[in-house]
Each structure stands twice: as structure tokens, then as C-alpha cells.
């Protein structure tokens, strides 16, 4: 009889705990929805500081809100890039990558900023990550080829250039680089490479409203 009573008590406590967790989850979801609404309103006004703050609070309460935070961080990061606030831009893209590490576009955006401050080693790493995620994107090979050439690594620069031409045989930038690299190999003379013409995509995919 005592064993039966103890078992009943344990089951009752477990039920109460489950109900409490469900109630708390429901409360958190409602609170997250409120912050999310504030974030969308800030987004419409292009107030990225407020949007990031609101979506961050929402994501802390409900992980389903994380994509909205990722989008807001990218928008603010690109705004920082435009304003030449490069450390702040890198910080936002880095936070976005912690939440979505499989997004090649974010690696590209961070690498673009790293190139702006001549941090070529980090940019090289980020473009390599982008290539792993999107191995058929010609632009990534062109950028990485440019970095290799800037660092004096003609062999790897040529390898990426040839990969770009394999993906896009008519790519004029790749053709010009290959000609220049071949001349450099022949003359064994360091020639300063012109920067690539392409740039990161204009904006991240906007998160849909719930």
C-alpha cells in the first residue's frame, strides 16, 4: 500500500512538473512573439539596432525566432560595412554565423569586410568555408584566387582561376587573371592584381512574418 501511494505521488509530481513546463513554454512563446513584432516594426523603419535587440530577446525565449535575428544581424552588418565600421560589421556577421553556420552568404559578407581591412588570412578561411557550402559558385573562386594572388601564391591562385573557368568558361575576369598569372609564372615577376569586380549580394533573405 505504501509503495502504491509513493508511486501515485511520483506520478502526480511528474504531471505537475509537465504542466508547469508547458505553461512556461506558452508564456515564453507569447513574450517572444511580442518582441518579434517589435523587431519587424523596427525592420520596416530600418532601425537595425532596435531590430537586433528585439529579435535577440525573442530568440532567447523561443529558438524559432532565431532566423529573424540572423536576418537583422546581416542587415546591420551590411549597414556597418557601408559606413566603414568594419569591426562592428564583422562582429554582427560572426554572431549570425553562430546561429546559422551553414549559410555561405554570411561567410562571403564577413570575408568581404575582412578583405577591406586587408585581413587576407581570415578572408581566405571564410571564402573556403563558403566554397564548401556552395562549391559551384564562381564568385567565391574568383575572390579566393584574388587573395592567393595578393599573397603571392600563384599556384593556388591559378588552381582557383581554372576552377572558375571550368564552371564558367566565358568568365572574362577569370580569363584575364589566367593570362596575367601565366605571364607572372613566365616572367616570375610580382605584379599587383586588380581587385575583383563582383561584390556580395545586396541583402539577406528576409525572414517571413509568423
Segments (PLM) and residue ranges:
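Position-specific recognition of the canonical hydrophobic site in helix A of tetratricopeptide repeat
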Residues: 36, 43, 74, 81, ...
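Conserved structural position within tetratricopeptide repeats
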Residues: 57-60, 64, 95-98, 129-132, ...
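Canonical tetratricopeptide repeat
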Residues: 71-75, 109, 143, 177
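Helix-start (N-cap) detector for alpha-helical repeat units in TPR-like alpha-solenoids
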Residues: 32, 66-70, 104-105, 138-139, ...
Amino acid at each position: 500500500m505504501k509503495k502504491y501511494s509513493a508511486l501515485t505521488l511520483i506520478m502526480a509530481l511528474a504531471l505537475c512538473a509537465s504542466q508547469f513546463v508547458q505553461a512556461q513554454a506558452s508564456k515564453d512563446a507569447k513574450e517572444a512573439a511580442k518582441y518579434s513584432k517589435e523587431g519587424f516594426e523596427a525592420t520596416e523603419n530600418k532601425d537595425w539596432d532596435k531590430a537586433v535587440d528585439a529579435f535577440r530577446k525573442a530568440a532567447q525565449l523561443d529558438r524559432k525566432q532565431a532566423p529573424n535575428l540572423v536576418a537583422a544581424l546581416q542587415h546591420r552588418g551590411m549597414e556597418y560595412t557601408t559606413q566603414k565600421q568594419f569591426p562592428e560589421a564583422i562582429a554582427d556577421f560572426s554572431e549570425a554565423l553562430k546561429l546559422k553556420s551553414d549559410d555561405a552568404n554570411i561567410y562571403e559578407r564577413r570575408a568581404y569586410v575582412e578583405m577591406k581591412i586587408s585581413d587576407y588570412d581570415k578572408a581566405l578561411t571564410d571564402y573556403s568555408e563558403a566554397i564548401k557550402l556552395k562549391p559551384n559558385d564562381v564568385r567565391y573562386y574568383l575572390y579566393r584566387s584574388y587573395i592567393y594572388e595578393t599573397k603571392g601564391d600563384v599556384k593556388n591562385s591559378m588552381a582557383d582561376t581554372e576552377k572558375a573557368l571550368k564552371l564558367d568558361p566565358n568568365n572574362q575576369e577569370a580569363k584575364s587573371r589566367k593570362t596575367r598569372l601565366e605571364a607572372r609564372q613566365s616572367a616570375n615577376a610580382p605584379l599587383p592584381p586588380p581587385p575583383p569586380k563582383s561584390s556580395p549580394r545586396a541583402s539577406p533573405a528576409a525572414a517571413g512574418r509568423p
